[in-house]
Amino acid sequence: KDKFPPDSVLITYLDDQDKYVIPVIDRINSGFKLRNGTFHKGLDIHLTRTTPVKAAFNGKVRYARFNTGGYGNLVIIRHFNGLETYYAHLSRLDVKENQLVKAGKVIGLGGNTGVKWSGPHLHFEVRDHDFAFDPEKIFSIKDSVWLGDKILLKKADFHSVIAASRKYHRIKSGETLSYLAVRYNTTVSKILKINPKLNINSIIGIGMKIRVR
């Protein structure tokens, strides 16, 4: 299986049959960047709790429910151009999983579910093969325009996300792999997969550093 991301990848996200819509047009509160030691994998766009949030492209809803990992009410749409888009912190969900949607379809209303320390905003991500890249590489919210129908991304466009997405835990007394799986909303099998030196029978010692994401 080919590794992703490659050195570079050309994505054609629009063609003559595709339509597109910027999900919300307002000011950007926070961009795609390292923030407080963690990489922020999308844009935080200001809105109100009554602002309609729209699908960026035609596609199929893969996820539409409350997410306990910090996204709150989250909609994920898998698009026919190969990309996925994430719409987080919604106050209301207006679509269901496996529903086909057109670009511009209202998928929910703005909110701040999943976060306690900030006002209403849309956290918006664009991903290719589950690797996020800067949404402002394909459109400008400030100018309300798309920046073309293709984008050439290099490995560096994904690199900081890959590195910063890794999370480690140092074992304390009494902690087990099952405990880590529950705490970090994952599974034991996934933890073992990203820690090749561990197996289900490994002895977990105090002070051991284990990757959990």
What are these regions (language model features)?
Residues 29, 46, 60-62, 91, ...:
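Conserved positions in beta-strands of structured domains
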Residues 192-206:
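Short acidic, glycine/serine/threonine-rich helix-capping segments at coil-helix boundaries
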Residues 154-187, 204-212:
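Primarily a LysM-type cell-wall glycan-binding module
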